[in-house]
């Protein structure tokens, strides 16, 4: 460079795109060389007429493409030189900064610095640190380190400082420093503290740290800046060229900074990368017009620009070269059988093959670049993202794949093996392809899944088809029996849980025996499905159901369940038209044809029962699901319920089912049913099936996660078949309850989750129940089935509509249910009697184990006894005994089969054991039902009437019915008990779903965001469903309500029965107190009347659905109160219960996580007291009635 020319001092300190950053530059001022480095302050005049100002050099860089030497500086003016002028607020040492930094070419900046600044008199005259002071103690090194770390932002300025020292700049007279106001204040403070000390103390590290400034210059001037202003004329200065400002932020700014870069980034792949900015800008259009992506060769562009060829000619030449290169490259690569199909992206822009090739050749080719590790330079030339950490590798691999073969070809090195990295390159490509295929495959899978779901909804799988056909038969039969659209809602609800199960279980089933078209086959399929579902866990079912809920695909899985449910449905139909209808009507509603297929299959049902016993787990689950659907309201009822309980998604699903059931097969409705159940609640915290599954699995343990949405059966879930048999036994008695509970459960998504967990189990139980009762159902008139499903639908409708009009029609069914319910309730009544509670608990526990073992073995016997019980409704006690006997036998079978399941938590309160509990309860109920059932029957009849009057018109299952008059109620309980057990099992499984239906019952529930606020009927239904299995005591209420239900059958049968039972229980027992505690756990009316007063209608606990489920779900004994607590007067009085509810509602039991509640209070209590599972529900049922 010439003596006066500018030159960089020191090594570059940064590289970014086309910019090379430096720390200092040297120029000649008044004939003497001077070095300005980053952070230096110096006087400048922007124009000869402008006032003197201070410039802070902040950035120095060279733009490689245009060879521009640029600087960025911040200017400081005295207050009087600003438009506003100086005022009293300005300090004597204050300067004001220009808000915008100025970009100035170095030559112009040097011109600005050439001026006379002797007139500057402002600033604090600081005492310079004498250089001699630095000689001692290495203070100079310390000061240099301080300046490097603090003043120079950590950049290594040693070389610059050395240059400055060589020039003697340390002694520069004109040295100005502008501090921030805080720095200035600290500096002044330090000066004051060391005013009597030598200036060398400022070099002390502590003095420096405390704000001291060691100034080396002879005449330092300290100023501070705390404000900025907009300079009016600075923009007009010709020297200021902001257009050259470096683009350093965000994505490749280089493109913006450098016209070439911009062109290349703009995707025109300018050929002008190396051309001067002007040339580049002019050539942009051409480059962009160029079809080829590659940028022009930098070298060629530079040469042309340097040669000052016409800009257009330069651009054209670059473009021509680029075109020729691209043509040759593409041709060669195509001939080489490695055509270039897609140009990859580097950073944020597509690779310009021409630019990449030119840059590589410029640096010596592939071998040289790789040896020197200069691929990052190529990446920079391509304008890649500066922040990329894999730029070099990616660039090299792209080059190896796209250009290296051609480069070798040009150099005659074709035979030279390509770098070993190329395979990696290919691998990357293959990986990309694989990723693409994976992505597309995932999409396909998702789409296929969706299609499968839709197909399931619309066209069941082979197994599903058989199931659908059976379901269609079922539906046809149910429709024939019911001749009402009620089944539609219930099937929807049912279908939803089933949909989940079917989705999860159906696939397995289809694999297992997709071709099985017989109901028996379907039962086995359902069993397999249930087992697979259990193995797979509820998660798959739950996840898939969410999709089906709105779709009919979920219903199709439901259809698979429906066939399973249909056997039990048929059994239920035999036992009670209502249960049958409940299970069947879903299929009817959903498929309409499935039932007819079932009717066709009915004859095989007996043989199917055996097959189903094996298949029961799935069948029970499907049955439970179907049961949910079976608790169908007439389409009118459903609509009414939907209207009444907008909160209940299940109701919505019922509406959907109404449409779909009428329009489509039950399979379609299943998904819908399930999802509405899962999402039915207006709960703000609706959980996804997976989340619910996780929550449930946490609550109930691994078994819960396996396939019981309810959670209490989790252990049984893993052994679904055993559970299914067990559930069949308990499901027979609980079947009616569970079906009713299914209705209510439908209205609660949270309940549904539990129900789904238990639903498999419930389906299994149902299946076994259906197997047991298949003959009854088969033998029973279609009217019975219709009546039952209608009755359950009515219960649903009643629970939502609180209708009493159809109770007469329901009475018979209710009686049947009441009988079945009464069996369990008497047992529960014993629980509730303080003397009986412990003995009953022990008996129940004993029966549970015995019955579990005997359940499966005795399933046929149970079916026979169940059939006998249903057939001999006139002899409720006999039925009860038979049912219990069969229950015990089946329980034993189940226990044998479920030994493993029993190994799992045997909490009677747990859903899995609820079946066992039911049987145990039934056994206890048998023993205690004689006196207590009569007692409970009368009590519950009265209570059920009252509760009916309140909200639940007919009290089917009041946990407290145990003490009711035993004979008639017992007959109801016994004849209905198998049904009740089924209902209970059904409700256990549907416990989650059931609360929803209950909530649908009452407007309060509808308004309530949390299931806890389920109407008393809802709770009653839930309790009836869930508790009924454990406590048939409501059977008398059922009986009483059964009559009303007969009339309410289509409108309020289920609701009434449940409500009645709950009411009876509340009145007849101390249990009512529990109701206030967990509104979701207790009958809706209680919660509505008692809790609603305490809990906002919209109150929704995060665990609300779980709580609701607990009401229905054995998994969570909502208030698993100790039997002692139950016996005590704690829950005796409604007022006490209300208070207790307040406290409990306020307390953690409800507030705490469902798992906590379960594990802390429910499981221990459940484990200790099988009653606990029932007491809370019963209590809730009782108390709501009392409140009512």
UniProtKB/Swiss-Prot annotation:
Signal peptide: none
Post-translational modification: Methylation at Lys-337 prevents DNA-binding. Demethylation by PHF2 promotes recruitment of the PHF2-ARID5B complex to promoters.
GO BP annotations, alphabetical order: adipose tissue development; adrenal gland development; cell development; cellular response to leukemia inhibitory factor; face morphogenesis; fat cell differentiation; fat pad development; female gonad development
Tissue: Widely expressed. Expressed in lung, heart, small intestine, kidney, muscle and brain. Also expressed in spleen, thymus, endocrine organs and in uterus and testis.
Location of this chain's protein in the cell: Nucleus
Segments of this protein annotated with the region Disordered: 251-278, 413-614, 958-978, 1030-1066
UniProt protein name: AT-rich interactive domain-containing protein 5B
Organism for this UniProt entry: Mus musculus (Mouse)
Gene: Arid5b
